[in-house]
């Protein structure tokens, strides 16, 4: 099952269609890919963009399924410094980053998009960490808030325990 939510930039409620998981579970993410983190991989349908961040690959697989179904552009949101493969080290870093975000300090990411003008819908996928949107995606959305204003956004998330609703408060 793939929960999704969407909104259209208005203040209306979303349209509806805990902890980071262990590798192989359902929180997404991943290693090196030789694509440029500022250029979406183009698909045949340029009206949609799938943005995602993923640590273990679960969210990435969901993003790829959407991309293949819609034949649209796709782009991975990557942290500036990759996460450790050590699970406990990753958990510590995730907790530190979430605490920093609550103080208004967002962790650095490599990914940026110059213009969303051609996209009708932007799909945003992320793992849920400690009940929250994964920090790389929080940073991306914070950095691109003005460029995304008024766009239709469709959320999808992977989680081993938490639901999507608390991750978008």
Which residue ranges define each predicted feature?
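C-terminal motif of bacterial Sec signal peptides marking the signal peptidase cleavage site
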Residues: 2-6
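Bacterial signal peptide processing site
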Residues: 7-11
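N-terminal beta1-alpha1-beta2 submodule of the flavodoxin-like/Rossmannoid cofactor-binding fold
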Residues: 14-121, 131-133
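Short, conserved loop/helix-junction motifs that constitute active-site signature segments
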Residues: 116, 142-150
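Glycine-rich, N-terminal phosphate-binding loop of Rossmann-like dinucleotide-binding domains
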Residues: 126
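Charged helix-capping and loop-helix junction motifs
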Residues: 136-142
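Short, glycine-/small-residue-rich phosphate/pyrophosphate-handling segment
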Residues: 154-169
């Amino acid at each position: 099952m793939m929960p999704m939510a969407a909104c259209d930039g208005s203040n209306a409620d979303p349209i509806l269609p805990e902890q980071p998981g262990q590798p192989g579970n359902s929180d997404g993410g991943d290693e090196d890919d030789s694509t440029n983190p500022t250029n979406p991989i183009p698909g045949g349908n340029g009206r949609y963009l799938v943005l995602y961040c993923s640590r273990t690959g679960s969210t990435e697989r969901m993003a790829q399924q959407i991309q293949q179904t819609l034949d649209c552009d796709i782009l991975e949101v990557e942290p500036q410094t990759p996460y450790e493969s050590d699970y406990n080290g990753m958990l510590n870093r995730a907790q530190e980053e979430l605490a920093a975000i609550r103080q208004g300090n967002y962790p650095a990411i490599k990914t940026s998009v110059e213009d969303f003008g051609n996209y009708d819908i932007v799909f945003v996928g992320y793992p849920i960490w400690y009940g929250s949107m994964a920090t790389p995606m929080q940073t991306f959305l914070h950095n691109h808030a003005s460029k995304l204003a008024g766009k239709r956004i469709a959320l999808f998330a992977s989680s081993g325990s938490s639901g999507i609703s608390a991750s978008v408060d």
